[in-house]
Amino acid sequence: MNKDSMSPMCFLDVEHYVVSHNEFGENGFDNSKLDKASSESLLQGLKNNGLEGEDDRALEVILSMGKDKFMSYAKLYSIENALGELVFIPGTTLDRIIDDILFNNDLCGELSISLSFFRNNLEPKLGESISTWAEENDWSGIISEHSINYMNREKLAKASFEAIWMDYDMTFPREVARIIANEYGMDEYHFSQWLNIASYVSGLAQFRNKLVDHVFLDEMECPKNLVSRFPLWNNKVNMIGNLILALDYLNGVEESHFDLSLENKVWGLLDEYPISPARIGFISNNKTNQEAKRA
């Protein structure tokens, strides 16, 4: 398979590429940590199969995670083809995967990676802008209570939760999304991340039967062509996933993961919101293709 192939990337192709281009000695492949050379080989294997992205950022993540964790996370974007092979959902890019790993690193369990790019270039600027807006609009209590000096998803989501319970509206998360979109010119990397926060808190509000406006795309006048480039964010699976995170938050679980303990909630929601079986793997990739078809 080469870059010009019309077929989606198969995970086995990438694994074979890495093994064939590195010497691992008698003990075979070292799954615990990839060195730089083997990380570069894995990246090259991905790119040879059509997944392009920013090399330096991808290498940093792959080096920190190791092959198994990286490929496990990448499988969230996979479906099973007619031959029973795991392949990427059409339209998936390496940048898309890396962006989600950097932003949603809590989904990777013990993953420990450098977030220097995220913290140094994203959080201080957003923290200052959002704090300024909050003070000017009598929301400073939300900011100070949660000590949001450096923005991240968990703190911002909790502040948004608090805002919803206080005033029964979506002013705080909606304005946060607007500020972020405006400051970064609706660029792909930041908008895709922070749109997730908007739907994350929106899912919580909807679960609590609050009458809120959760259609952020129209309010921010997001270009339609930009929305179309984020198929995995702008669909029902993403909203269901965020709703499950909200359910866990209400149950006192502050750090949620898409794990097997959420299975019943997932399938119950899928019964209410039928979607393509191909998308189900995004939430519960342990299910077989045959089981997924029942949705």
Indicate where each model-derived feature is located.
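C-terminal substrate/ligand-recognition segments
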Residues: 203
